Swiss-Prot record:
Gene Ontology CC terms, in alphabetical order: cytoplasm; exodeoxyribonuclease VII complex
UniProt gene name: xseA
The protein's name: Exodeoxyribonuclease 7 large subunit
Catalysed reactions, semicolon-separated: Exonucleolytic cleavage in either 5'- to 3'- or 3'- to 5'-direction to yield nucleoside 5'-phosphates
Secretion signal, residue range per the UniProt entry: none
Role played: Bidirectionally degrades single-stranded DNA into large acid-insoluble oligonucleotides, which are then degraded further into small acid-soluble oligonucleotides.
Gene3D superfamilies xref list: 2.40.50.1010
Location of the protein in the cell: Cytoplasm
């Protein structure tokens, strides 16, 4: 038996292993994962409960992965055994990697969902409210599709006042994602302009999962999330649930269903308006009756108030006239009395003058008695100074006065007088 060097034996092992295990499929758990930022190569180990084997995934193959490789994932790798002669190491040079129980597309979608969930793309708090009565709606679909024809038909029946605008878009195959993203951006660019859309509806009919899978793309999700206009996703049939359905402000099971959800039913609203009209008419009649009754009550009150004010003013005028008459009469009597006092005592002895004096005194006493017994209004009182009637305008500060009526008598001092 020939003696071999280490290099020779490793070279023979390399030739044997690489020829024998040219293509292998190996299942195990990913561990010790390292991804080089510069080269883009990924190095990791694949292990089970008893053994470990090193693996390498070079950049070109790594770029074809539809999901992110992470530690702890149960994977099936497809590749070939390669031997590094200087160290006598061997590893699996991976060409493809797939999840053990689900496909790579499914795993990639789940990872993307988690990424967008953490960014808040699915949060209800970030959803825009559905417009109540949309006037202008952008429909992103193929203008020759059955979906567009169905949507126009339903919209014309439900809410003919709404203008549907079709933005012709490639809805499957290569270039679909970019076409949809550009159409969403165009429709949303009119936001806050006179031609703004109240809603954007991304719609297409059913198809295979391969046909619909473009609507699981992150770029479409970004376009819907960043749009300032309310958006709806209406892709496929009710059983089809895509990433665009989760990100859009509202999901419809089909394009036709989108019109039923978005647009109000004009027949139902006409019935509601009829009901509102009846209620409004009834409420108006009740309100009119109440206001009429209130105005009648107010008119009666004003009439009573006017009568009472007039009565009060007349009473004040009468009282003022009585006081003026009394003052003039007393003034006249005092004048006559003064004249009589100037007459000599001898003259007063004449029977004629004696009779007149007695008559004058009798009149004065009668007037005072009438003054004492004069009936005043319940709110009034006689005003006098030094037992003589006086007008209010004649008073000055410091005067001591008497107030009296048939029930009481009071004294007072004038503190101030304001002239009107």
């Amino acid at each position: 038996m020939d003696v071999l060097s280490v290099s020779e034996i490793n070279a023979q092992i390399k030739a044997l292993l690489e020829a024998t295990f040219l293509q292998v499929r190996v299942q195990g758990e990913v561990s010790n994962l390292t991804i080089h930022k510069v080269s883009g190569h990924a190095y990791f180990s694949l292990k089970d409960s008893q053994s470990v084997i090193r693996c390498v995934l070079f950049k070109g193959n790594a770029n074809r992965l539809k999901f992110a490789l992470k530690e702890g994932q149960e994977m099936v790798v497809f590749g070939g055994i390669s031997v590094y002669v200087p160290r006598g190491d061997y590893q699996i040079n991976c060409f493809e990697i797939e999840p053990k129980e689900i496909g790579s597309l499914t795993l990639a979608l789940e990872q993307l969902k988690e990424k967008l969930r953490l960014k808040g793309y699915f949060d209800e708090a970030n959803k825009l409210p559905k417009p109540h009565f949309p006037k202008r709606v952008a429909v992103i679909t193929s203008q020759n599709s059955a979906a567009w024809a169905d949507m126009k038909k339903i919209a014309s029946k439900r809410w003919p006042m709404c203008e549907l605008v079709c933005i012709n878009t490639l809805m499957q195959g290569e270039g679909c994602v970019q076409s949809v993203v550009e159409s969403i951006a165009y429709a949303d660019s009119l936001h806050d302009t006179k031609n703004a859309f109240d809603a954007i509806v991304v719609a297409r009919g059913g198809g295979s999962m391969e046909d619909l899978y473009s609507f699981n793309d992150e770029k479409i999700a970004d376009a819907l999330y960043l749009a300032k206009t309310f958006s709806m996703s209406a892709i496929g049939h009710e059983s089809d649930f895509l990433l665009s359905d989760l990100v859009a402000d509202l999901r419809a099971s089909t394009p036709s269903n989108a019109m039923e959800i978005l647009l109000p039913n004009s027949d139902e609203w006409l019935q509601k308006l009829d009901g509102f009209n009846v209620k409004l008419h009834r409420s108006f009649k009740i309100l009119l009756h109440q206001k009429k009754a209130y105005l009648e009550h107010l008119a009666d009150f004003l009439k009573r108030l006017s009568f009472e004010n007039k009565h009060h003013l007349n009473a004040l005028k009468l009282e003022k006239l009585k006081i003026a008459l009394e003052n003039k009469t007393l003034e006249f009597l005092r004048f006559k009395k003064t004249l009589l006092e100037k007459i000599s005592t001898q003259t007063l002895t004449s029977p004629f003058l004696q009779t007149k004096t007695e008559r004058l005194n009798a009149l004065e006493n009668a007037l005072k008695l009438a003054h004492a017994n004069l009936k005043l209004p319940q709110f009034g009182a006689f005003l006098s100074k030094n037992n003589q009637a006086i007008e209010l305008e004649a008073l000055k500060r410091g005067d001591k006065i008497e107030l009296s009526n048939e029930k009481a008598r009071a004294s007072a001092e004038i503190l101030s007088v304001d002239r009107v």
